[in-house]
């Protein structure tokens, strides 16, 4: 074959291969995560005494429970006067790129500190978390360093933060024990602001945004606090509640869905508030069992009773008929 024919042929083969490669569907890389470990912890909200613990020192991914630390730093800035509720936070283009859950902020607009706190605690808005971080520290990365430093100051030895929202990062982790320390600290250090966690909705741009924290919204005596979820973390929840003068801080993490998570939380709270468990009461009540002979005897008695009733009805009808015939005559 001559060189003149060979060169175009090679070009055609290469070009055809390139077209096939581009046309072939690209396989999406499926990331598989290990099933999260379920952890739980209940402590006395006044003394810090541990009332229940299960895998509480196991390192976990906090997901949006991260935002409790973000809010802690906001409360601290409010207390020192660095921020005020009316202070306006600038929204950057970078902040608007945050993935849901979000408030769908627009680049260049501003949002107040108070609305930001509500958006974090009620909506769990990631774009707001980035906005807060950038306004308070210049960047989310710098803000995350401040979060980790504060964690150490609060005695959270097994916690590390890399972002303000809780978006998954393998290097962002904590434990139920550390989350309890953070919750106790935010109650203790900012009693004047802590009550904001009890809000179940807020209005932003004329739209009412409701909480999806069902336990906080419906459990008797619940005060707050925060939900969290992404696939590697599972469904997480921190709840604070007070009943009959007794205060509890409870953490539940790693559940497959919000229903099992909430059920677990309610059971823990009920148990340590001393609320009688209906299922336990039913289980403890002795259920009478019938032997076969007893069942036969009961069935026989029922049959006799029915037969007697039918017989009585016939007699009454017969008596009425006779009486009717006599009166006509």
Write out the residue ranges for each language-model feature.
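Domain-terminus/edge residues, biased toward the C-terminal soluble/receptor-binding domains
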Residues: 156-160, 168-329
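Bacterial N-terminal signal peptides
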Residues: 8-17
